[in-house]
Amino acid sequence: MSEITVALTPILTRGWGSNRSWTLESYLARGGYEGLKKANTMEPAEIVETVKASGLRGRGGAGFPTGLKWSFLPPDDGLPRYLVVNADESEPGTCKDIPTIMANPHVLIEGIAITSRAINCHHAFVYLRGEVVHVYRRLMAAVKEATEAGLLGDLRITAHAGAGAYICGEETALLDSLEGYRGHPRLKPPFPAVAGLYARPTVINNVESISQVTGIFQHSAQWYASMGTEKSKGHGLFSISGHVKNPGQFEAPFGITMRELIELAGGIREGHQLKFWTPGGSSTPIFTEAELDTPLDYESVGAAGSMLGTRALQVFDETTSVVRVITRWIEFYQHESCGKCTPCREGTYWLKQIMLRLEAGKGQEGDIDLLDEIAHNIFGRSFCALGDAAATPIMSGIKKFREEFEAGLTTPARELFPYEASSNFAKGGVR
């Protein structure tokens, strides 16, 4: 096992196994809110510079430098400005933010308090998926604990449950939803830093991004920057699901490889071998065994032809139909398209129709080339990134597994790859 695998750094996951880890009492016993105490002795600009020095990058998928994002806010004019935490975790395979809030909500609340001081915000919002009522309740209970303990000062934190629309994970659609409107992506500029929630300067960050701020101030910017790679500093949560023996959350420095993470997850299930995997969830181009040793950082994964995204590492063995998996993803994106722009609204519909034909073994001559053409016409032409998310797995799937798409012209996927064989819960499966 390599040195980087050995040097796992449990910060966000530290204490997850503790008795009642979500309570304030448990969090304080683990050194909680010490970072906030330190931040309260610093000027806002100094806090921003500390985050810049740490090299922290956004964990919602884009990887934009967090401190730089905060610095885009215009000078304080004495009127409200807001922090919005994006907890609308809805993409297939992505499952790191919800467990963080469930097991350790105070690490997020402490990060919110530090960030709010940095941007001079007195009202922060956490936007949650509407389906996760239990998470909403746990977060609200933790906010109440911190408020009653006098840890938050005059900061008000509001948890808001959305209505279940995936599009509201897009930051400006989230703002529309938070304001009570139907979630639709907004035209940019103006960017949220200038005119966001209620047309006021707003910082929007992912749950993990804000939670990482806590660790930086509990330790130091230098400590954080010492982990990871030259351009992808620090550590993060890697969510491994699918055909491995022990799926779950693994907190490790950037630069760890998928081969090492699969080893940590107990390996591929017994008697099977890896076929393909996603480095950043269903919206990223798929990888195969050839990329197992690619360092999992933004630059290396990008150079290899995909995106790190939310680090949702879905693992599929040889019993899995690529066509079937991509069809399920396309059905999701077509259903979740907000309908605002033509490429996404019409394109995802036709992608789904063709994929369903291929899955059923009823593909028509020219379907594969048409599928690839539609995907390329959607990519880069939709109003937001949802269109790209639908197109990329199809383009990479055809490139890497064209023979399976060709088989869909005559043979149903269920005959080539029986459902029972790929089920984790079938006889001989993971469990």
Regions found by a protein language model. Give the residues of each.
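Iron-sulfur-cluster electron-transfer modules
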Residues: 1-182
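Hydrophobic alpha-helical positions that pack around
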Residues: 136-254, 266
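Short amphipathic, charge-patterned alpha-helical segments
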Residues: 109-115, 253-271
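Short loop-to-beta-strand transition segments
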Residues: 69, 124, 267-281
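Short acidic beta-strand-loop surface patches of small beta-rich interaction domains
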Residues: 133, 242, 274-295
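Ferredoxin-type iron-sulfur electron-transfer modules in oxidoreductases and energy-metabolism complexes
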Residues: 34-51, 79-81, 87, 94-101, ...
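Active-site-proximal helix-loop elements at catalytic-domain edges
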Residues: 14-36, 128-129, 136, 140, ...
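Short acidic, glycine/serine/threonine-rich loops at helix termini
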Residues: 62-63, 67-70, 94-97, 136-141, ...
